[in-house]
From Swiss-Prot:
This is Ribosomal protein uS12 methylthiotransferase RimO. The gene is rimO. Binds 2 [4Fe-4S] clusters. One cluster is coordinated with 3 cysteines and an exchangeable S-adenosyl-L-methionine. Keywords: 4Fe-4S, Cytoplasm, Iron, Iron-sulfur, Metal-binding, S-adenosyl-L-methionine, Transferase. The lineage of its organism: Bacteria, Pseudomonadati, Bdellovibrionota, Bdellovibrionia, Bdellovibrionales. Belongs to the methylthiotransferase family. RimO subfamily. [4Fe-4S] cluster 2 binds at C163, C167, C170.
Length: 457
């Protein structure tokens, strides 16, 4: 009988949640491929399915559980042999999850994902241990195997793990631990490798970009790791065309940082800056270490020096104790500030967080009303903002055919991040995926722009 080895075993990934979790999936895929596994695109083609879960909010947890159960059904039908549960949900609930999901074969926390090849190999050889939990202290190095799951012209670049903030609504520190920053040298080395592989756009991700390097400098004040120094170093990477920053905390956006972004031809003028609220009392309850005045100062700093900047933010409505008056202050603030993009979440109480233990929780009907009211205000703003682009020519990176029809190409201009923002639909002109082209904008929709490629003689 032929002995099965890693060289003829197939694995499929289901990666849920944020881009930071996706990078962990990419590292697991790279590690397994290096060990001889084949990564396949469909679950029923695989021997093993790894569900990299999200445990951040209630909806994410439900989705993770459902996908695990779906894969368990495939296993019961004999279509796959093994179900591995990895990621944040596993790390957060540990033994409770193991007890509640006997159908799964292995449980790998976010502190052990880097050992996935060894864990799978030992399991295949008959080892009985099925739980692998540890503190999430792992930071990838330049040589860490990784498979870029994005279109070849873009990639996520994770610069740190964990978070030093303690927002009352957030479970991330419980799951991912305290801030651990990678060195600038390691980040730049990975950036160069990605660019050498064809990447034109790097999307910089962490739990808070503006805290980058604080942990390193606290241990050794002579070290240079800081947001500004990292930006300067990445700006020197040859062949890189766009650098996109995600998850900026408002009080960390300094004038020096804004000037570095202003002076760069690579760092796109795009600020992803979750504010969560604007009322001072609600911010205090959320344990957000800022005031409305400080938020407005940060916004003024950006707009004064970069009037063309695209600002994306997100808010939480229905946090415990939020009054109608406090919500209306937020609503008026959104109308006044005219943000380019806004995401809105209904507060979800999380176990073992200060917010989850608070009294005066808001009922679901009120949360839904506030969510819908805020998004209605923002939809009108977004439509107006997009109309301002009509008649302008924008640099666009081509992503492929439209999701709606193969008759249109689809791309993004520098003010659109993948997956969370709209797109540019191109109805005239030809280009290849990954091409940077100039597009003349002829029309707009609520979240998307429409245009035609400018042919340069």
């Amino acid at each position: 009988m032929k002995q099965e080895t890693a060289q003829n075993k197939k694995v499929h990934f289901i990666s849920l949640g944020c881009p930071k979790n996706l990078v962990d999936s990419e590292i697991m895929a790279g590690t397994l491929m290096k060990d001889g596994y084949e990564v396949v695109g469909e679950a029923d083609q695989a021997d093993t399915v790894i569900v990299n879960t999200c445990g951040f909010i209630e909806d994410s947890k439900k989705e993770s559980i459902q996908r695990i159960l779906d894969m368990s059904d495939l296993k019961q039908e004999g279509k796959i042999k093994k179900v591995v549960v990895a990621g944040c949900l596993t790390q957060r609930y540990k033994d409770d999850l193991v007890e509640g999901l006997p159908e799964a074969d292995l449980f790998v926390g976010s502190g052990e994902f880097q050992n996935i090849a060894k864990i799978l190999k030992n399991s295949d050889e008959g080892e009985k241990q099925k739980t692998f939990f540890n503190l999430p202290t792992y930071l990838q190095e330049e040589a860490t195997p990784r498979v870029n799951s994005q279109p070849g012209h873009r990639a996520y670049l994770k610069i740190s793990e964990g978070c030093m903030k303690r927002c009352a609504f957030c479970a991330i520190p419980l799951i991912r631990g305290n801030l651990q920053s990678r060195s600038i040298d390691a980040i730049v080395a990975e950036a160069k490798l990605l660019v050498a592989g064809g990447v034109k756009e790097l999307i910089i991700i962490s739990h808070d970009f503006t805290d980058y390097g604080f942990d390193i400098r606290r241990k050794d004040p002579t070290r240079k790791e800081s947001p500004v120094e990292l930006l300067k170093a990445l700006d020197q990477v040859e062949g890189l065309q766009w650098i996109r920053l995600m998850y900026l905390y408002p009080d960390g956006i300094t004038q020096e940082m804004v000037q570095v972004i202003k002076n760069s031809t690579k760092i796109v003028k795009y600020f992803d800056m979750p504010l969560q609220h604007v009322n001072d009392q609600v911010l205090k309850s959320m344990n957000r270490k800022m005031t409305r005045d400080e938020i407005e100062t940060a916004l003024m700093n950006i707009r004064e020096h970069l009037p063309e900047a695209v600002i994306r933010t997100q808010f939480i409505v229905g946090f415990p104790g939020e009054t109608q008056e406090q919500f209306e202050e937020l609503l008026n603030f959104v109308a006044e500030q005219q943000f380019d993009r806004v995401g809105c979440f209904k507060y979800s109480p999380e176990e073992n967080t200060p917010g989850g233990r608070m009294e005066n929780q808001i009922d679901e009907e009120t949360k839904q009303y506030r969510h819908d009211a805020l998004m209605e205000v923002q939809q009108n703003i977004s439509r107006e903002k997009h109309s301002d682009f009509v008649g302008k020519t924008l640099q666009v990176i081509v992503e492929g055919f439209s999701e709606e029809t193969d008759l249109l190409l689809q791309g993004r201009f520098w003010g659109q991040a993948p997956d969370i923002d709209g797109v540019v639909l191109i109805n005239d002109g030809q280009a290849q995926v990954g091409d940077m082209v100039k597009v003349h904008i002829t029309d707009n929709m609520e979240y998307d722009l429409i245009g035609e490629i400018v042919v340069e003689n």
